[in-house]
């Protein structure tokens, strides 16, 4: 019997055919994972993966992230019996003590096989989120001290931008006004901004992730946390009691800071967020 390599193919060999399909699937899975992991806004600190419950939560800065992290950490310790938030993983990584980090294999599995998981996230009115970012990072920063994520390069860049465009806020130790902040954001590309004020559809990677449910911060935060925790095996009674305690509250600026001009600018920046998440473009009044 002679072996004709030119006429031999996987088509007539079920075993080889299966191997080829399996290899193709592995490459496809890898591409899916890299498509997410390579994003600017992907971070394990913003992703809760519970493989056992087939549940993934993508956190969205300025949309209840600190509250959710605190609740998740408490739930893992008090209800799920974890020895620490991340079950001892990443011992030298301080953040892993304050948020449940999964194993690398579990992150890979979730994004390689997304059809096996339910994905969840929270969104917020773009005007409210934008105002909150400025108040928390700049108004309060100017008054009480800038957070680590703002002082240094980012603050210098904004002051340099203000100077080159003859806008207020360029002088060191002065407040960066909301109007200058919005203009600075407007000068940057979607997906390239700081995650606290970048467009939410980029932060949440909606083009790559199919969400089972998207909860609005306005009126759906408690419902969302309760539903997600229920999937993790956490009783509603525990979640309800845990959420009765005050959540993370930043110092607020109660007066309205949006003008029609600034609202128009913000509406243009966050146009897709308004459309995708169903927010009213005229909801800026009073903010």
Question: Which residues are covered by each model-predicted region?
Answer:
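Membrane-interface amphipathic segments in extracytoplasmic regions
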Residues: 2-287
């Amino acid at each position: 019997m002679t072996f004709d390599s030119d006429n031999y193919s996987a088509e007539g060999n079920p075993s080889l055919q299966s191997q080829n399909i399996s290899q193709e699937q592995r490459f496809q899975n890898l591409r899916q994972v890299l498509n997410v992991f390579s994003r600017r806004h992907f971070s394990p600190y913003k992703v809760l993966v519970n493989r056992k419950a087939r549940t993934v939560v993508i956190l969205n800065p300025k949309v209840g992230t600190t509250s959710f992290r605190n609740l998740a950490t408490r739930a893992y310790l008090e209800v799920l019996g974890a020895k620490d938030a991340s079950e001892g993983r990443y011992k030298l990584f301080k953040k892993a003590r304050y948020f449940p980090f999964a194993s690398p294999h579990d992150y890979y599995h979730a994004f390689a096989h997304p059809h096996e998981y339910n994905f969840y996230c929270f969104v917020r009115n773009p005007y409210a989120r934008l105002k909150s970012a400025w108040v928390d990072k700049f108004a309060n920063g100017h008054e009480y001290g800038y957070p680590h994520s703002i002082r240094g390069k980012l603050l210098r860049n904004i002051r340099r931008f203000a100077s080159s465009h003859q806008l207020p806020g360029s002088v060191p130790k002065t407040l960066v006004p909301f109007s200058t902040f919005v203009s600075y954001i407007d000068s940057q590309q979607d997906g390239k901004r700081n995650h606290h004020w970048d467009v939410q559809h980029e932060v949440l990677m909606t083009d790559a992730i199919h969400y089972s449910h998207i909860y609005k911060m306005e009126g759906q935060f408690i419902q969302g946390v309760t539903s997600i925790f229920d999937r993790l095996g956490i009783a509603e009674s525990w979640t309800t009691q845990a959420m009765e305690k005050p959540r993370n509250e930043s110092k607020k600026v109660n007066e309205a800071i949006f003008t029609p001009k600034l609202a128009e600018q913000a509406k243009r920046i966050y146009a897709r967020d308004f459309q995708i998440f169903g927010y009213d473009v005229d909801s800026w009044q009073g903010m």
